[in-house]
Amino acid sequence: MHKTLQPKIILTAILAAYAMHQHAVAAENGKITTKKVEVVSTTPLAGVGLPLEQIPSNVQVVNGEELLEQRSLNIADYMNNNLLGVSVNETQNNPFQPDILFRGFTASPLLGTPQGLSVFQDGVRVNEPFGDAVNWDLIPVNAIAGINLMPGSNPVFGLNTLGGSLSIVTKNGRTHQGGAVETSFGSWGRKNTAAEFGGVSADGSVDYFISGNYFDEDGWRDYSPTEVKQLFAKVGWQNETSRLELSYTGADNNMIGNGLIQEELMRQFGRETINTRPDQTKNTLSFLNLNGSHWFNDDVQLTANTYYRQSNRKTLNGDVNDDFDYGDVDWNDACLGAVSAEDAEGVCSGALNRSKTKQDGYGFNAQLAFSQPFMQKQNQLIVGLGYDHSNIKFNQSTEFGIVNETRGVDGLGLESDEAVVDLRGKTDSWGIFATDTLSLNDQWHLTMSGRYNHIKVKNTDKINPVGSIEEVSPGIFEDVTLSGNHSFSRFNPAVGLSFTPTKDLTVYGSYNEGMRAPTSMELGCANPNVPCKLPNAMAGDPPLEKVVSKTFEFGARGNLTSNIKWSGAVYRTVNHDDIQFISTNQTNGMGYFDNVGKTRRMGLDLGLTGDMGKFSWNAGYSYLRATYESDLELTNEVNSTSNGDSIQVKKGDRLANLPDHALKIRMQYQVTPNWSVGTNINSFADVYARGNENNKHQANQGDPDDTYQGSGKISGYT
C-alpha cells in the first residue's frame, strides 16, 4: 500500500507547480520502457491533473527553469515576451506596475482598469478585494516553480475569470534543493539581488525553502525611483499518504511611476520628462497560506488550503487641478508647458491626492478528486467549494497646491472638503464547483464543469450616512452616501470535447461561461453626475450589473516532428453588461464606472516551437479584434468629436489599448550545460488611446491652446 501511494504524494507536491512529465513505467522481459505524459492541473488547487491531450483549451505552461533562463524581472515581464495572446500596457512607466493583457482582458495594478483575469498563488486568489487589481510587485519571481495560463471563461476558477486565469505555484525544498545567489546591475542605477535556498531533513519528512529579492533603481524617467523588497518562505511535511505546506509571502515596496505625458511636452523636453509628480505607490504584504493534501486510497484525494492575507496600499499623486484658483495661479492647457527650470514657480494650480487602502482577507478552499471508472470508462471527477472574506478600509483626501519648477506639487495646507472619503467595505464570497472528464474511448474525452458563485458586498460610508442629499448638479439632488448592500449570484457552466486520433494530433472545442461581480470600489463610483478621481473620490451611485462572459474556443495542437511542436486556436468571447471606467476630464483623472452593454473579443493564436541540437526556438502570432457590440453614449470632453461633452460609440468600434497583431520570436543557444545565450523579438501593432473609444478623434492643428491634442492612437513597436 505504501509503495503505491508514496509516489503520488511526491507527485502532488510537484504537479500544480507546472505541467510535468509523469512517467508510466512498464516492465516486459526485464526491459523498462517509459512514456512521457504532460500533466496539467485544471483547478486552482494542486490536484491530480489531466494529460494535456484531454484538456479542451490552449493552456500555456511555464516551468521555473524557463523563467530562470531568461532572467525575467517579474512574471509580467516573462509573459509579455513569451506567451501567446499576451501584451502589456505600461501606463505607469514602472517595471513592476504593467497592465497584463491576455486575449483582450486585463490584470492590472491600476484601479479603474476593467479587470478580466483571475490570478492565483498556491490556490489563493490574489486579485485585491478593492477593485480586483493585481499587484505584480507582490509576487516574488524567484519563488515561482511554474505557471499555467488557462484561457477562456473557465467557471472552475471562480470570480473574475472572464478571459482567462493564471495559476502560480511556488517552490518547495523537496523540488528545489540547494542554494543560489544572483546580482545584476544596469542603467539608471538599477541594482537587483536575488537569493534562494532549499533542502530536506535527514529523515526525509520535512522540507524547507526560503528566497528573497531586493530591487532598486533611479528609473529612466525623471524623479522615478523604485525600491522592491520581497521575502518568501515555505516549510513542508509529508508521509506516505499526506502532505502539508505552510508558506509566507512578504513585501515592502515603494514604487514611483510618473505615468503618461502629453505629446507636446515630450517633444519639448524629451521622453524622460514627466507631467506632474510624484505618482507614488507603497505596497506592503503579509500572506500566510496552509496547503494540505491526503490520499484516502489509490483513487481518491482531498486537497485543501486556508489563508490569511493582509495587503496595504498608500498612494501620493501630484496632479494639476482645474477646479482651484489661488490668486494668479490657476490651470489651463498651456501652463505645464511654461513650467520649467527657467520659469518662475506658481504658474499652475495643483493638488496632492492621498489615499490609504487596508485589505484583510481570509478564507479556505477544498476539493475532492475521484479517479475512478464510470460505466467502465476512465473518468476523473473533482468537486470543491471555497469561501473568501475581506474587510476593506479606504481613505482619501486632497490638498490644494501649486506646481513647482520640477513639476512637483507643493501643498498649501488647504484641504478639499469634497474629496474626503472614509469608506468601510466588506465582501463575502461563496462558490461550489464540479468538473468531470470522461474518456469515451482512447481518442475522445468529454469535460463538463459548473460553478455556482454568490457574493455579498457591503459598503459603509463613515462621512455621509444614508439620506445625505446634496445638489450634485444644477437642479439635480441625490443621496451621496457610499453606504449600500449588494449581492450577486450565478451558475456558470462549461463543456469541452477533445479528440486525439494519433499521438501527434489533438483537436478540441469548448464553450464556457464566467462572471465578475462589481467591486466595492466600482459600486461606489458609478454616477456620471458625480464623477470620481481614482483611486476614488466616490459618490452615491446607481447599482451596477454583474458582468457575464461567454466563450467559444476551437483549436488543435500536435507534433510536426519529434523536435517541432505546433498549436493553433480561434476564440470568441462576449461580455454582457461589461463594466468600464469612463473618463470625463482630460487633466484630473475624473470619471465614473458604468455598464456599457456588450463587448466582444475574438481572435487567433498560432504557436510553433522546436529545437535542433543546442539551438532552440519558438515563434508565436496573435490576432485580436476587440469591439463594442452595443451603441452607447459616453461622457467625454477631450475627444474632438464630442458633442455637448459626450461621444457616440457604435457597434464595431474598437476597444482602447488592445493591439490587433502581435508577433513573438525567441531563439536560444546552449553554449555549455550551464550557460546559454538567447534573445527575444516582439512586435505589436498600434492601438487606440483611452478617450478615443469611438475611434474618430482627430487632433486639431495650429492652435497650441486647443483642447483636442494627440492623434488618438498609440504607435506600435518592435
Task: Outline where the language-model segments fall.
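Transmembrane beta-barrel wall of Gram-negative outer-membrane proteins
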Residues: 178-180, 185-216, 221-258, 278-297, ...
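Face-selective signature of the C-terminal outer-membrane beta-barrel domain
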Residues: 243-245, 283-466, 567-570, 608-611, ...
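Structural signature of Gram-negative outer-membrane beta-barrels, strongest in the C-terminal barrel
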Residues: 359, 378-388, 423-574, 622, ...
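Periplasmic plug
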Residues: 61, 92, 98-151
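Membrane-embedded beta-barrel scaffold of Gram-negative outer-membrane proteins
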Residues: 291-295, 301-319, 500, 506-512, ...
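Gram-negative outer-membrane beta-barrel transporters
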Residues: 367-371, 442-443, 563-576, 592-693
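Conserved C-terminal beta-signal and adjacent last beta-strands/turns
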Residues: 12, 20, 26, 198, ...
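A beta-strand signature from Gram-negative outer-membrane beta-barrel systems
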Residues: 126-128, 137-180
